[in-house]
Amino acid sequence: MGQLLSLTWLLLVMVVTPWFTVAGANDSPEARRCSECHDNATCVLDGVVTTCSCQAGFTGDGLVCEDIDECATPWTHNCSNSICMNTLGSYECSCQDGFRLTPGLGCIDVNECTEQGLSNCHSLATCVNTEGSYSCVCPKGYRGDGWYCECSPGFCEPGLDCLPQGPSGKLVCQDPCNVYETLTEYWRSTDYGAGYSCDSDMHGWYRFTGQGGVRMAETCVPVLRCNTAAPMWLNGSHPSSREGIVSRTACAHWSDHCCLWSTEIQVKACPGGFYVYNLTEPPECNLAYCTDPSSVEGTCEECGVDEDCVSDNGRWRCQCKQDFNVTDVSLLEHRLECEANEIKISLSKCQLQSLGFMKVFMYLNDRQCSGFSERGERDWMSIVTPARDGPCGTVLRRNETHATYSNTLYLASEIIIRDINIRINFECSYPLDMKVSLKTSLQPMVSALNISLGGTGKFTVQMALFQNPTYTQPYQGPSVMLSTEAFLYVGTMLDGGDLSRFVLLMTNCYATPSSNSTDPVKYFIIQDRCPHTEDTTIQVTENGESSQARFSIQMFRFAGNSDLVYLHCEVYLCDTMSEQCKPTCSGTRYRSGNFIDQTRVLNLGPITRQGVQASVSKAASSNLGFLSIWLLLFLSATLTLMVH
């Protein structure tokens, strides 16, 4: 029995011992082969022993390895001035905003002020670098947070002013010699006569250029000069370039008081040899800033073809050439410009000087219209009159083809005249457009009526029938015979009086089968100022825009064996100052076309369909009788004065 028990223990030991050996091998880094090591472990073979060891940055027995979070504790990483970011088996140091990682130095501060594109400071601000960031500081005299800076008026450095810059209009200290508007009006010259200009919209820095002068007058200017009532002049001398911006008083002369009104302005002398002025609107109207015409001279660049450039005491100036001298007034070279709204006559200043006119007093029939100096290709003495009957003593003369405006230019070398009074007559002729063809025809088919405005003057309105779309060939005789394929060209014209304010408007134009303009059978061509849209042959060329109105339509006949067509147009003188005269026909009409004022109706006809004989003598007689109709329009007193 004892031997059997010993044998049992021996067998048990033989079976259990290998099991303990295998189990012990699995609990240590030793392995039977390297494939049993973890992916992040290193396998070492030492004879018969295989050892697994976790790599740096990992922890475990080699068979199992886990990542070590170096960022979890401060002593396991070296990111003292940066941000630690754990990675698999290691870590990285990421610099904070405003810092840059440098090998061996870690994170160091970035200077945003020296590296392009890193700061967003305003262009005028100063960038100040700080640890990990920066700040922006506006310059002295500016307000803002540094990202936006704007100057404060009165705080700019000497010689600069707070002015808007670019499209944004930001206020920036700038040199007004580089930022100004240019005033080129020749009428600002103290030589120019009276007018009604007022500088009520002046605000900012300006430079005077052109023939009127390049700087303000420094002495009291007589009233009714510079195209204004009360001329404004600089009460004080102009500054030198080293003085920078100076303040001066601008005075206005009126009622025998050279400084009845005044305003403060600023002046600066610029390096280019010119002045700029910080002007403000005058205290009253009509006041305007005046220039000294003698200030135009100064550089040889301005010399004309009739002048030489000479040096006088170190200053270059223009001097008249001897070749252009004349010995008789009749040889004076002149320049006459006939513009749409004004007439200008100019005389050679050099030739006037050669005749002894060191000073030139030039005026028209109305002495209020005086001459002025004007420099261009040549040096001229010029004078201007409106192309109208009345102003400056201008007289209108009219014939069948042209309207002619005439005046007389007077020349003197002194204010008073004792010996010779030099007079130069001049005139400009203007063609009368559509009216020419009517007045040159022997017997045009035309209807006319007279319109009086407040009893101050008469306007004549005519209506005529033309053969062509240019309205230059009127039909002649008491009647017209046309086929239904032909086109009628109808023109109405306003003649006489001052046409600068009123335009001709056709309010209703229609056709009837009889000469009676009140015939109940009417075919409207224009109704309530607008054309009949259903008739595509109607073309309104002009209406409510000028002194004439025109339309065309294809010939037609009335139903019911009626071969005669009569045209009738109700016309109206529209005041452009207070009314909308040009029709707008896309929407609501102006008024009902049922009522037509027969005292304002022009009549034409008869127009007979070709191939039909008709007695028209009675109709023509009736039509000619209409020429004596006068239409009275009662307007307000203000309008009457304007027309008068």
From Swiss-Prot:
Region annotation (ZP-C) maps to 457-592
Q: What's the protein's topology in the membrane? A: Lipid-anchor; GPI-anchor
Attached lipid, kind GPI-anchor amidated serine, located at 615
Q: How is it modified after translation?
A: N-glycosylated. Proteolytically cleaved at a conserved C-terminal proteolytic cleavage site to generate the secreted form found in urine. This cleavage is catalyzed by HPN.
The cross-references to InterPro entries, in alphabetical order and at most eight, read: EGF-like_Ca-bd_dom, EGF-like_dom, EGF-type_Asp/Asn_hydroxyl_site, EGF_Ca-bd_CS, EGF_dom, Growth_fac_rcpt_cys_sf, NOTCH1_EGF-like, ZP-C
Region Flexible ZP-N/ZP-C linker, as annotated, extends over 433-456
Task: List the residue ranges of the region (Essential for cleavage by HPN).
Answer: 589-592
Give tissue specificity per the record: Expression restricted to the thick ascending limb of the loop of Henle (TALH).
Task: Check the record and name the SUPFAM superfamilies matching this protein.
Answer: Growth factor receptor domain
Q: Where in the cell is it found?
A: Apical cell membrane; Basolateral cell membrane; Cell projection, Cilium membrane
Q: Could you tell me which residues belong to the region Beta hairpin?
A: 151-174
Signal peptide residues are 1-26
- Residue ranges for the region (External hydrophobic patch (EHP)) are 601-609
Query: Site: Cleavage. Where?
Result: 590-591
Q: Which residues form the ZP domain?
A: 337-592
Task: Write down any Gene Ontology CC term.
Answer: ciliary membrane
**Pfam families found in the cross-reference section:** D8C_UMOD (PF23283), EGF_3 (PF12947), EGF_CA (PF07645), Zona_pellucida (PF00100)
Q: Keyword annotations for this protein? A: Cell membrane, Cell projection, Disulfide bond, EGF-like domain, Glycoprotein, GPI-anchor, Immunity, Innate immunity, Lipoprotein, Membrane, Repeat, Secreted, Signal
Q: Which residues are glycosylated?
A: 40, 78, 235, 278, 325, 399, 450, 516
Transmembrane feature ranges: none
Query: What does the entry note on its domains?
Result: The ZP domain mediates polymerization, leading to the formation of long filaments. The core of the filament consists of interlocked ZP domains which assemble into a helical structure. Each ZP domain consists of an N-terminal (ZP-N) and C-terminal (ZP-C) region connected by a flexible linker; the linker allows the ZP domain to wrap around the ZP-C subdomain of the preceding subunit. The heavily glycosylated N-terminal part of the protein (containing several EGF-like domains) forms branches which protrude from the core and are involved in pathogen capture.
By its UniProt entry, which PANTHER family does this protein fall under? ENDOGLIN/TGF-BETA RECEPTOR TYPE III, UROMODULIN
State the name under which the record lists this protein: Uromodulin
Q: What is the lineage of its organism?
A: Eukaryota, Metazoa, Chordata, Craniata, Vertebrata
